[in-house]
Amino acid sequence: MEVGVRILGTFCALLAFCCFVFRDIPVPAPTFALPVSSAPATPPDDKERVRSEIREVEKLLPETPERGAALFFLAELYKHLGEVDKVMVLLEECVALDQGFDPGAVPGFQAFRENARFREMVEQVRRRYRPVQHGHVAFTVADKDLFPEGLAVDPEKRVFYMGSMHRKKILQITASGEVSDFAKAGAYDLMPVGGLRVDPVNHDVWAASDPGVKNRSELLHFDSHGKLLERFPAGGAGPHDLNDLVVRGAEEVYTTDTDGNAVLRLDRKSHRFTQVRFPRPIFYPNGIALSGDAKLLYVSDILGVMAVDLLTHEAWDVVPDPHDTLAGIDGLYWYRGDLVGVQYGTAAFRVMRWHLASEGRRVESSEILERGSDLVKSPTTGAIFEGSFYFMANTGIENLRDDTILDESKLEPVRIAVVPLK
């Protein structure tokens, strides 16, 4: 869910994100040169769900430290209701905050390209945020139809693990790029494999899976040789989509439930899920990370990053740099007191590093590691290994819909890129 500043380059990838967030809402066919005056209003079937989200987000506006993210999200919601004037006002205020949000990269906004106000906003963002490239391709996985979502690394074994949404399996990749199956397709009746993490103590591998055709989203626990040891369906009233996860010691696993708008804690002894509480509603949570001492849990959603102290249960919004945002992070990782992530929330995909203050409650400064290059064509997650951040550059997820490949001519080997963390 994740690429540069070119409108056509971002269209397909962001269409996948919009279809994910509004997966129960029909998305109109794209129109790249339709004047705003003739743009059809295509209200979703579920108007009330969208209006309910609007009410919740508007309540947060007076106090949220992520005002730009809230405005950008509201603009997308109002676009789905066909309220064009409201969209323009929200986008103008958002862009004026200079936090990197790029309206021109949102598929739903392409109908506005002939609107002078919209064009000026896009040009302003493009002048301000130029391409940044610090990375290069580390190795390539030859299979073209994997559509990977999750990447993890075992630094001691020097092995990467990559999950396949389409093949429904997990690969292992050596640091030199040699590829083999870790959990074979068909072996355990897996659904599309999402986030992955390695237990640093025993080298076991944990995975989260999408609901798939059997509507069975679950956490999966493999031993270090690829044998499935345990599986934990989300259960309870849905919908559920367990997206990413972190392993905290031998007793608990935390996972983001994107469709359920929740973060869940799995008690490994009782095998029960409980919901983590936050001070505000959470919208489509995705990336998740633990601090180095495992006391703080960081969770990304469409409005930013929230943190929770796992000892006191106090939770808060992490305050971003005034001219930056923490909104919409797919892969989120802790590194030497900082957060590193693959970000889609600004609409133009980028790899970021956020330098946190010592208490972990606010960002002191941020650094764009990759933006607007072929290395962020359709990125999702990554892994930190030997002082560098490895991430999947071209997952192709925008070319997969309901487990069907939309255009086989666009299939290509998966490139794993790397950028140094100074």
Task: Give the predicted meaning of each segment.
Residues 43-55:
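Helix-turn-helix repeat elements of alpha-solenoid scaffolds
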Residues 100-125:
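TPR/TPR-like alpha-solenoid helical repeat scaffolds
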Residues 127-147, 365-366:
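A short helix->beta-strand "capping" segment at the edge of beta-propeller domains
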Residues 142-157, 165, 187-211, 235-253, ...:
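Beta-rich, blade/repeat-based domains predominating
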Residues 174-178, 223-227, 267-271, 309-313, ...:
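Short loop/turn segments that connect beta-strands within beta-propeller blades
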Residues 217-225, 353-355, 406-422:
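Beta-propeller blade signature
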